[in-house]
């Protein structure tokens, strides 16, 4: 199971931030398989683990821990694809944000959740536990949305506060320079709290007819995306973010899918030859393997994310699934990957 992926438009702001810092992004991008051809492809996506590693490498090589804030300040509405172009034509800032939230899946898929809008709050989902690899993701997401608010209203929109889940990092003073409002750390959510009047501001490029046309295109793209997702994938999407909390029941998942419980049970059997509890167990197993293989999260952090009572319980479960302790599995995978990369470089030399 994948942790998710992003449209390559999300890399444009990282590219611009590095250039603004006097860095050439091309060698770094190519090291992570991000070529000019990939950046120009309309359907291209990059996995979230690769995005994390690329961002962390950019921080290290530019010596700029606050690079996520710089990324957000470099964002353009066009980076959000068709949904961004539709949002630009909305009648108000509130409608623009609602458009971006509704069609977020066109440019971003993350099993941890999706952004939400509950005026005056525009919220980015939690990606805790936090570490040096993922702070920049929250920074860039919130800074980008703040920047869009300014762009779409010709600088008139105002933030009241910014709330961030993780504790203040070493570069905390950079936040108020970026957001121009109080920034509170250690909060219950990652969110921008807008001045309510700002959300009613008209957009500088509002165009009702064009907005309606682009909304139809976005809706068509979303329907096509859903049409190609099997019932199992839709259940996994609901179950996955809840693994570290109380797991949803079959009836609760059915309600979210707009199906009677018996219909969901029947469709899982006939279309996927599986049961609801099997999906829960297999989702936990697949995510455990993905976290060990593709991230640098500590074992205790992975245990928390997957709802295990302790690190020891996670290690026992992982050994049962794979026949190896998680640490040994990770080391073996990394060694194999390093050997393959060495062979590939030798083959091109």
Q: In which residue ranges do the predicted regions lie?
A:
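Short, contiguous, pocket-lining structural segments
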Residues: 6, 20, 133, 137, ...
């Amino acid at each position: 199971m994948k942790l998710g992926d992003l449209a390559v438009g999300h890399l444009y702001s990282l590219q611009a931030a590095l250039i603004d810092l006097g860095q050439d992004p091309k060698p770094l991008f190519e090291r992570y398989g991000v070529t000019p051809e990939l950046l120009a492809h309309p359907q291209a996506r990059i996995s979230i683990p690769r995005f994390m590693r690329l961002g962390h490498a950019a921080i290290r090589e530019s010596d700029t821990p606050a690079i996520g804030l710089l990324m957000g300040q470099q964002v353009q509405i066009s980076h959000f694809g068709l949904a961004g172009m539709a949002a630009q034509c909305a009648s108000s800032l509130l409608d623009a944000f609602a458009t971006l939230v509704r069609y977020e899946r066109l440019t971003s898929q993350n099993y941890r959740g999706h952004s939400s809008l509950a005026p005056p709050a525009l919220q980015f989902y939690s990606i805790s536990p936090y570490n040096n690899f993922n702070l920049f993701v929250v920074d860039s997401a919130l800074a980008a949305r703040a920047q869009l608010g300014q762009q779409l209203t010709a600088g008139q929109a105002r933030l009241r506060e910014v709330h961030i889940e993780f504790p203040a990092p070493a570069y905390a003073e950079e936040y108020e320079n970026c957001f121009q409002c109080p920034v509170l750390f250690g909060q219950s959510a990652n969110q921008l709290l807008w001045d309510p009047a700002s959300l009613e501001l008209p957009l500088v490029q509002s165009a009702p007819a064009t907005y309606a046309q682009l909304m139809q295109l976005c809706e068509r793209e979303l329907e096509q995306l859903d049409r190609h997702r099997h019932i199992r994938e839709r259940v996994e999407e609901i179950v996955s973010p809840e693994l570290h909390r109380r797991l949803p029941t079959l009836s609760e998942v059915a309600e979210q899918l707009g199906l009677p419980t018996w219909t969901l049970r029947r469709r899982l059997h006939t279309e996927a030859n599986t049961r609801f509890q099997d999906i829960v167990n297999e989702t936990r197993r697949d995510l455990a393997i993905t976290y060990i293989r593709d991230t640098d999260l500590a074992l205790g952090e992975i245990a928390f994310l997957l709802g295990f009572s302790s690190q020891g319980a996670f290690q026992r479960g992982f050994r049962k699934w794979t026949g190896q302790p998680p640490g040994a599995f990770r080391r073996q995978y990394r060694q194999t990957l390093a050997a393959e990369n060495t062979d590939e470089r030798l083959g091109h030399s």
